[in-house]
């Protein structure tokens, strides 16, 4: 940072390049931005901690990003404001180098976290069958650690030890900037590695993500008939499984569980882990049926056998105390997250009257599953996650591009960049840390609701907010 300095002067009015009212204005604005950044990123971190619906792999990456942004809000913004309004660096060369190392390592960690988020979403969309198996909390932790370690290796040694590498410290007293920025090769190398290359990669990844998402939505829209046809009786099995208490094998208590989907094992939960950051919604009719059946009261059960066209196999055993009703429905194409089977257990019914009531419940379930399935809406959760990534990516490019362009220009022509323009460009990088929490809230309803509960001190049931 090439601020005009005069370390021999002690008065603010003499050393500061700004007038008194300008200093007050800068301090108020910078202090407000710092406070908003701190509060916003603390809200993100606390929201993920207290709300179990936000404790997803994707949001763990956002948690790491919020940690980096919080450090920027606490240290980087305030020290740079001090440096700006006073007009010189008052804390000595050691603190200067430590501040610069922390500032650039944390800022680059933000970039690396954005890169990880983009890669994570890309693999979720392009490899929905294989990637979720590897997408574990442990893997996320390793990726986050790698982002921070790489950022440290890229910036900290060069900032802290460059003066020893070249044999002299060229940064004058009262100034604080990275010494190797005067070296064109090193400046270009770090700028490309820290900004330009990640931006290119993230842009390409987002283009592929967007194209894959649009292709999936178009494919679903082309199949309205398959989504609206009634479920065929051959694909609906209502089975009453009555375990014999005298011959119950170990393990599952004698209940029979068969998962059938056109002769293949169902693809349960294949991509559900990849659609993170949003509330999980149930869109399968058999799931709704199981909820209705489990909540039925005896007085709600009426014998309406004429409405059932599917026969139900059953066996009688007065000693049995469990009934298992299993519904297997045909999974919709393109909806690999929807369960293909639902098991409903009715406990406590025995004897002939109990069997009759259970049979009636089974018939009602089969009747409900035979109703025409509602057309599944477009995958809004997937669109919201993609939209969040787009918002974060655009905010990053807009706020970081001016400074990184000026860094390259400064290598060849330092006087070409006015001090005020440099300061604004530097501050724009910091403002990105202020914007990120707003991106989460605007693009993610669960984050937004949790933020609201925390700010209004409504802690009841906050852990289950959707």
Swiss-Prot record:
One GO term of the biological process aspect: G protein-coupled receptor signaling pathway, coupled to cyclic nucleotide second messenger
Residue ranges, annotated region (Disordered): 218-289
PTM note: Phosphorylated in response to agonist treatment.
Disulfide bridges in this chain: 96-176, 413-416
Modified-residue entries (Phosphothreonine), positions: 446, 450, 465
One Gene Ontology term of the molecular function aspect: arrestin family protein binding
Biased composition (Basic and acidic residues): 254-270
Subcellular location: Cell membrane; Postsynaptic cell membrane
Bilayer topology: Multi-pass membrane protein
List of residues that carry Phosphoserine: 232
One GO cellular component term noted in the UniProt record for this chain: postsynaptic membrane
First-listed, main subcellular location of the protein, grouped into a coarse class: membrane
Keywords associated with the record: Cell membrane, Disulfide bond, G-protein coupled receptor, Glycoprotein, Membrane, Phosphoprotein, Postsynaptic cell membrane, Receptor, Synapse, Transducer, Transmembrane, Transmembrane helix
Gene3D superfamilies xref list: Rhodopsin 7-helix transmembrane proteins
Domain of life: Eukaryota
InterPro entries, sorted: GPCR_Rhodpsn, GPCR_Rhodpsn_7TM, Musac_Ach_M2_rcpt, Musac_Ach_rcpt
Extracellular side, ranges: 1-22, 81-97, 163-184, 411-418
Sites where a glycan is attached: 2-3, 6
Sequence similarity: Belongs to the G-protein coupled receptor 1 family. Muscarinic acetylcholine receptor subfamily. CHRM2 sub-subfamily.
Cross-referenced PANTHER family: 5-HYDROXYTRYPTAMINE RECEPTOR (PTHR24247), MUSCARINIC ACETYLCHOLINE RECEPTOR M2 (PTHR24247:SF207)
Subunit structure: Interacts with ARRB1 and ARRB2. Interacts with RACK1; the interaction regulates CHRM2 internalization.
Function: The muscarinic acetylcholine receptor mediates various cellular responses, including inhibition of adenylate cyclase, breakdown of phosphoinositides and modulation of potassium channels through the action of G proteins. Primary transducing effect is adenylate cyclase inhibition. Signaling promotes phospholipase C activity, leading to the release of inositol trisphosphate (IP3); this then triggers calcium ion release into the cytosol.
Record's protein name: Muscarinic acetylcholine receptor M2
Species in which this protein is naturally found: Rattus norvegicus (Rat)
